[in-house]
Amino acid sequence: RKKFKDKDLLWLFDDIIDSADGLPIGNYLSQYLANFYLTYFDHWIKEVQGVTDYFRYADDMVFLSDSKSFLHKLLHNIKKYLTEKLNLTVKENYQVFLVESRGIDFLGYVSFHDRIRIRKKTKQNFARKLKRGADKSTIYSYLGLLKHGNCINLKNKL
């Protein structure tokens, strides 16, 4: 309401957000609203908290640091900020870990220092769909994922 003054637009937002289903996952409006709503958080995390290595897509976030204690303190500050300022909560499935050994699972890929792989589950789903005779659009979608995931051997097997 700070940014939008148009009554019709505000009514539409209220109607969508307050509906029984809430914002549908994957809907373009959901992505835009999440990015818009979390813009203040983005500024706070960088300017006030001094975080330099931070990635976010909608409500999925990754923070990088050499210090686990810094990340734990940051997590505490994030929970407080999101609760008090934006009326949001952090799911309890967050993780703080060293990335050298296991990589970062984010947006369908697992990223390591020297390579990017697609998730194991994604590979399994793709193989299953190929066996069942998936349509062209599904196959091309998966091939697009493989293209960005250092998956030359997997592509050759297929």
Cite the ranges covered by each PLM segment.
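Conserved polymerase palm-domain catalytic core
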Residues: R1-A58, V62-I78, Q95-S101, N153-K157
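Right-hand nucleic-acid polymerase module
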Residues: S19, H72-K73, V90-L158
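Aromatic side chains
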Residues: Y37, Y54-Y57, Y81, F106-Y109, ...
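Phosphate/oxyanion-binding loops and surfaces in catalytic or ligand/nucleic-acid-binding neighborhoods
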Residues: K3, K7, K85, H113
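A common structural junction motif
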Residues: K79-L88
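Short polybasic/polar patches that bind polyanions
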Residues: E47, E84, D105
